Curated annotation (Swiss-Prot):
Belongs to the NusA family. Residues 308-378 form the KH domain. The keyword Cytoplasm applies. Residues 139-203 form the S1 motif domain. GO terms for biological process: DNA-templated transcription termination; transcription antitermination. It comes from Rickettsia conorii (strain ATCC VR-613 / Malish 7). This is Transcription termination/antitermination protein NusA. It is found in: Cytoplasm. Keywords: Cytoplasm, RNA-binding, Transcription, Transcription antitermination, Transcription regulation, Transcription termination. The gene is nusA. PANTHER family: TRANSCRIPTION TERMINATION FACTOR NUSA, TRANSCRIPTION TERMINATION_ANTITERMINATION PROTEIN NUSA.
Length: 503
C-alpha cells in the first residue's frame, strides 16, 4: 500500500486550474493516469492497475483490480468468489476487489507526472476552451493586440486566446508592429490539435459589412439592408444599400453627417475609399447606380444579354475612362457588386461591334441553314446570333419576322435543328475520342462546344475538374453565365466525387 501525502501536487493543480480556467478534476484525473502508467510500467501491463489521488489530502494509492469470477482463468486480473469473501464478506460475482500495491517512488513519479502531464493537458484544455469560447463568434468583429509577426502572418493576442491573420488576409500596405491594437473579422474557427484555431481577416467583404453595422444603427436594426459588397481591400469598395421605408435615405444614412460614418469605416480600413450606392431590383437602374462616380446622364445605352449574363454599357468617348476607372477598378467592382459582367464601350465601338456581329451572324446563317443573304440578314436583325437560338425558338417567334410565313419558319427551324444535331454528334465523337467521362459532361451542364474546349485543355475527368481553380474555369468559359460561387461549388463537388472514388 502506498500512503504518501502529496499536498504539493494538489497545490500545483489548484494553481494551474485557477490561472488557466481549467477544471481541477480534469487535471487530477490526468495525473492519476500518469501515475497509473508508471505503475503498469513497474509491475507489468498484464495487471489491471489503477491510481487514486485523495482530493483533500493529495494521498496517492496504487491499486490492483481483480474481477470476481466463478472460474479463474487469469490469476493476474481475476479472483475466485471464495478468496474474495475472505477480503470482503459482502463480495459477489461480478464485483471488483482492490488490492494495494507496494509503493513506487511516488515523489519522483508524481512530480514528473504533474509537470509533464499537466503541461500537456493544460495545452489541450486551453485549445478546447479557445475553440468552445470562439466557435459561436465566427462572423463577428473582434479586437486584439499584435503579439508577434511570423513570416508576414500576424499572431493576435485575444486575452485568453491567440488568433492568426494570414498575410493574404491583411490589407495591402498595412504595417502592424507588436503591441499595436488591431480589429479584424472572425472568418473561421476550427478545432485543431496543433497550430492556429482562430482565423481572422481584414480583407473579407463581411469585415466591411460588420464595420458599417457598428457605425450605422439603422443597419444594425435592419431598417437599412446591405444588399451586396465589392472590395479591392485598402483601395476602393462599393456597397449597395436599400431601405424598404421610402422615407429613409439609405445612402445618406450610411454616409452620415459630414461623412462621419463612412469616414470611420475608411479610417479603420487603411484609407479604403467607399462608394455607397442605392440598390434596385431594376437591373438597368442598379447598373447605373453601381457605376458611380459616372453620372447617370452620361450613359447612352444599356444592353442586357441574359443568356451570357452580360451587360454592355454605352458611354461617350470622354466618359469611358471614368466608367472603367483606374486599371479597370470601377467597372470591375461594379460587376462584382451587381453580379453581372459589365462591358464599357463608346458609341463608336458599340456601332462597330454590332455591325461586325451582324455580318458574322448573317454569314453563319447563310452557310448553316443554306439560305439567301436577305433571310440571314432578317434573322440577324431580329436578334438571333446563333443557330442554337433558332433551333430552340418557337415557330410563332419566327413568323413575326417580316416575310416569314409559317411554312418558311418551319423549314428554317428544322434546318437549324438538323444543323445543331449534326454538330453535336461530331462534338460527342470528338469527346469520346479524347476519353472524356460522361460524368464530367453531366456535372458541367455546359454546351458541348464549351465541354470540348475543356477537354482540349486537358479536363477530361471529374478529378481533372477538381484540380482546377476558379480563374482557370472562367478563362475556359468566359461567356458562361455561371457565377464564381457556382464555379466553386462545381469544383468542390468534383473533389468530393474524386474522394469517394479513392475511398
Amino acid at each position: 500500500m502506498s500512503n504518501i501525502g502529496n499536498v504539493e501536487i494538489l497545490q500545483i493543480i489548484d494553481s494551474v486550474a485557477r490561472e488557466k480556467g481549467i477544471s481541477k478534476e480534469i487535471l487530477i484525473s490526468t495525473v492519476e493516469q500518469a501515475v497509473q502508467a508508471a505503475g503498469r510500467k513497474k509491475y507489468g501491463n498484464e495487471y489491471d492497475i489503477k491510481a487514486q489521488i485523495n482530493r483533500k489530502t493529495g494521498e496517492i494509492n496504487l491499486l490492483r483490480i481483480l474481477k470476481i469470477v466463478e472460474d479463474v482463468e487469469d490469476y493476474l486480473t481475476q479472483i475466485s468468489l471464495e478468496e474474495a469473501l475472505i477480503k470482503n464478506p459482502e463480495a459477489k460475482i461480478g464485483d471488483e476487489i482492490y488490492e494495494y500495491l507496494p509503493p513506487i517512488d511516488h515523489a519522483r513519479v508524481s512530480a514528473q507526472a504533474a509537470k509533464q502531464v499537466i503541461t500537456q493537458r493544460v495545452i489541450e484544455a486551453e485549445r478546447e476552451k479557445q475553440y468552445h469560447d470562439f466557435k459561436d463568434r465566427k462572423g463577428e468583429i473582434i479586437n486584439g493586440i499584435v503579439k508577434r509577426i511570423e513570416y508576414g502572418d500576424i499572431i493576435v493576442d485575444l486575452s485568453r486566446a491567440e488568433a492568426i491573420i494570414k498575410k493574404d488576409q491583411l490589407i495591402k500596405g498595412e504595417n502592424f508592429k507588436p503591441n499595436d491594437r488591431i480589429k479584424a473579422y472572425v472568418q473561421d474557427v476550427r478545432q485543431e490539435t496543433k497550430g492556429p484555431q482562430i482565423f481572422l481577416s481584414r480583407v473579407d467583404n463581411q469585415m466591411l459589412v460588420k464595420l458599417f453595422k457598428l457605425e450605422v444603427p439603422e443597419i444594425l436594426e435592419s431598417i437599412i439592408q446591405i444588399k451586396s459588397v465589392a472590395r479591392d481591400p485598402g483601395s476602393k469598395a462599393k456597397i449597395a444599400v436599400f431601405a424598404a421605408d421610402s422615407s429613409i435615405d439609405p445612402v445618406g444614412s450610411c454616409v452620415g453627417i459630414r461623412g462621419n460614418r463612412v469616414k470611420a469605416v475608411t479610417n479603420e480600413l487603411n484609407g479604403e475609399k467607399i462608394d455607397i450606392v442605392l440598390w434596385s431590383n431594376d437591373l438597368a437602374q442598379f447598373i447605373v447606380n453601381a457605376l458611380a462616380p459616372l453620372a447617370p446622364g452620361e450613359i447612352t445605352k444599356i444592353l442586357i444579354d441574359e443568356d451570357r449574363h452580360k451587360v454592355e454599357v454605352v458611354v461617350s468617348q470622354e466618359n469611358q475612362s471614368i466608367a472603367i476607372g483606374r486599371r479597370g477598378q470601377n467597372v470591375r467592382l461594379a460587376s462584382q457588386l451587381t453580379g453581372w459582367n459589365i462591358d464599357i464601350m463608346t458609341e463608336e465601338q458599340e456601332s462597330k461591334r454590332r455591325n461586325e456581329e451582324f455580318l458574322t451572324s448573317t454569314a453563319l446563317f447563310m452557310e448553316a441553314l443554306d439560305v439567301e443573304e436577305v433571310i440571314g440578314q432578317l434573322l440577324s436583325v431580329t436578334g438571333f446570333n446563333s443557330v442554337e437560338q433558332i433551333a430552340s425558338s418557337e415557330i410563332s417567334t419566327l413568323t413575326r419576322i417580316e416575310g416569314f410565313e409559317e411554312e418558311l419558319a418551319v423549314e428554317i427551324k428544322n434546318r437549324a435543328i438538323n444543323y445543331v444535331d449534326l454538330k453535336n454528334e461530331k462534338i460527342i465523337k470528338k469527346l469520346e475520342d479524347l476519353g472524356v467521362e460522361q460524368e464530367l459532361i453531366d456535372i458541367l451542364e455546359l454546351s458541348l462546344e464549351l465541354i470540348l474546349q475543356f477537354a482540349e485543355y486537358g479536363i477530361k475527368t471529374i478529378e481533372d475538374l477538381g484540380e482546377m481553380s476558379v480563374n482557370e474555369f472562367k478563362n475556359l468559359a468566359p461567356n458562361s453565365n455561371i457565377t464564381d460561387e457556382n464555379i466553386k461549388l462545381l469544383i468542390k463537388t468534383a473533389r468530393q466525387h474524386g474522394a469517394l472514388k479513392d475511398s
